[in-house]
Amino acid sequence: MAMTVHCDIVSAEGEIFSGLVEMVVAHGNLGDLGIAPGHAPLITNLKPGPITLTKQGGDREVFYISGGFLEVQPNMVKVLADTVQRAADLDEAQAQEALKAAENALNAKSSDFDYGAAAARLAEAAAQLRTVQQLRKGK
């Protein structure tokens, strides 16, 4: 039996996952992080994107988070997400539409244009699409 670590994924809406996992892969500010049992303690920001859990037995589960924090302790990994959704529940067509709308907003700047908000919408839509693609790859 493979070594495991307890993982919790929570958001303001509540807990979406709690259980033993063999590996957690998340998208941090400096790139992807792979957390396995015995990983050094750390706290880091998470960018919008997929979180992949490899559960006992090798089954994988993918979630989308809109950002948050990752805390690693010797026997525990905790993801504190702004919002979290199971990747299977994401609507790819809606994410594509949001991506196009964000790109159009960036290209059609008006006098009251908020570049930061438009860039954030673009990044979130792109992260949702990346999550859907990762889910498809894993099947």
Curated annotation (Swiss-Prot):
Keywords: ATP synthesis, Cell inner membrane, Cell membrane, CF(1), Hydrogen ion transport, Ion transport, Membrane, Transport. It comes from the Bacteria. Pfam families: ATP-synt_DE (PF00401), ATP-synt_DE_N (PF02823). It is found in: Cell inner membrane. GO terms for molecular function: ATP binding; proton-transporting ATP synthase activity, rotational mechanism. GO terms for cellular component: plasma membrane; proton-transporting ATP synthase complex. The keyword Cell inner membrane applies. Gene3D superfamilies: ATP synthase delta/epsilon subunit, C-terminal domain, F0F1 ATP synthase delta/epsilon subunit, N-terminal. It is a peripheral membrane protein. Its main location: membrane. The keyword Ion transport applies. InterPro entries: ATP_F1_dsu/esu_C_sf (IPR036794), ATP_synth_F1_dsu/esu (IPR001469), ATP_synth_F1_dsu/esu_N (IPR020546), ATP_synth_F1_esu_C (IPR020547), ATPsynth_dsu/esu_N (IPR036771). F-type ATPases have 2 components, CF(1) - the catalytic core - and CF(0) - the membrane proton channel. CF(1) has five subunits: alpha(3), beta(3), gamma(1), delta(1), epsilon(1). CF(0) has three main subunits: a, b and c. PANTHER family: ATP SYNTHASE DELTA/EPSILON CHAIN, ATP SYNTHASE EPSILON CHAIN, CHLOROPLASTIC. Belongs to the ATPase epsilon chain family. Produces ATP from ADP in the presence of a proton gradient across the membrane. This is ATP synthase epsilon chain. It comes from Pseudomonas entomophila (strain L48). The gene is atpC.
